[in-house]
Amino acid sequence: MTLPIHQYPALLAKKAENLTALLAPFNAPELDVFASDTSHFRLRAEFRVWHDNGDLYHIMFDQATKQRYRVDQFPIASQLINRMMTVLLAEIKGNELLTRKLFQIDYLSTLSGQIAVSMLYHKSLTEEWIEQAKLLKQRLIGYGFDVQLIGRATKQKIALDCDYVEEALNVDGQIYRYRQVENSFTQPNGKMNIKMLEWARACTANSKGDLLELYCGNGNFSIALANQFRKVLATEISKSSVESAQYNIAVNGVDNLQIIRMSAEEFTEAMNGVRVFYRLRGIDLKQYDCNTIFVDPPRVGLDQATLEMVQGYEKILYISCNPHTLADNLKQLTQTHRIERCALFDQFPYTEHIESGVWLIRNNQVGEK
């Protein structure tokens, strides 16, 4: 697999042109465009495993033809993943316990040098498998890997030591530490994530009052933004993400951030007094003066009720993984707010995917940060 690196500037320019056109009806200012590294930028990857007369190798499927193809090196993935791909298969080849009915391998790496390898099977994992996996892990450590090894099968998950890696990001000269659990969402392009965090901090610099974040995940944004605000209230529905967020809050010494496990839609109902939630016991929403809201919704964008709630805030920071639903949401948001800043973050080079951000301020807040 080779990358069209020489085409990257033109591909990025085309994305910027497309996003600029989508934002044009809303009087958006000039885009801040953040380019990615042109190779080895992706920190996670997953592959099917193909067994062929005693040999085995990683495969992927062509999106157009659906035909499988062999993958020995994967230049969009981190150097760490590429090195592990080669060493891992060499170490398990010929080991019946570790290779039999192995159908997929997932890799999660970090900028900090740690990597988690998840091996997925169409069989139950036995004590014998665990013993062989422990020996495999020791051999991988012998190669210099800081590795966690996880086995998964139907209704089974075995982490030899733990099921997470620890990331460290240098954001505006400060190190933020994040626990990232395998098979949970993490930002795939680590260096671009840093650029997104720094852009979000630049937008919210000198903010007054409190911040509300919907869809906070493992606290990626809310932790980095916490010292910009008096207090931060954040929501997330995934149990594993909430647990990671709580750990990340503690390890970063953040004392003004509260995470609530509920969906954005449920929180909207709570704010509007539609329902009373047991999960909100002990949390007095009236103690928060949230004049800024941060949203990073799924591809479908914000639902109508949440969109209306978001309009009630003076300042809106909206990170989008789908510029078309962003544009659709902006039709309503720009009735009350104006776009002060907008950005393109090239999380996924060589694809049509566009990650973007907009910073909106209520129309009567002229000249205010």
UniProtKB/Swiss-Prot annotation:
Any one annotated GO CC term: cytosol
InterPro entries: MeTrfase_TrmA_AS, MeTrfase_TrmA_CS, SAM-dependent_MTases_sf, TrmA_MeTrfase, U5_MeTrfase_fam
Record flagged with keyword Amino-acid biosynthesis: no
A Gene Ontology biological process term: tRNA methylation
Active-site feature positions: C321, E355
Keywords from the named record: Methyltransferase, S-adenosyl-L-methionine, Transferase, tRNA processing
Single GO MF annotation: rRNA binding
UniProt KW S-adenosyl-L-methionine keyword: yes
UniProt: S-adenosyl-L-methionine binding residues: Q187, Y215, N220, E236, D296
SUPFAM superfamilies reported for this sequence: S-adenosyl-L-methionine-dependent methyltransferases
EC number: 2.1.1.-, 2.1.1.35
A Pfam family assignment: tRNA_U5-meth_tr
Catalytic activity: uridine(54) in tRNA + S-adenosyl-L-methionine = 5-methyluridine(54) in tRNA + S-adenosyl-L-homocysteine + H(+); uridine(341) in tmRNA + S-adenosyl-L-methionine = 5-methyluridine(341) in tmRNA + S-adenosyl-L-homocysteine + H(+)
Function: Dual-specificity methyltransferase that catalyzes the formation of 5-methyluridine at position 54 (m5U54) in all tRNAs, and that of position 341 (m5U341) in tmRNA (transfer-mRNA).
Family: Belongs to the class I-like SAM-binding methyltransferase superfamily. RNA M5U methyltransferase family. TrmA subfamily.
Protein known as: tRNA/tmRNA (uracil-C(5))-methyltransferase
Source organism: Glaesserella parasuis serovar 5 (strain SH0165) (Haemophilus parasuis)
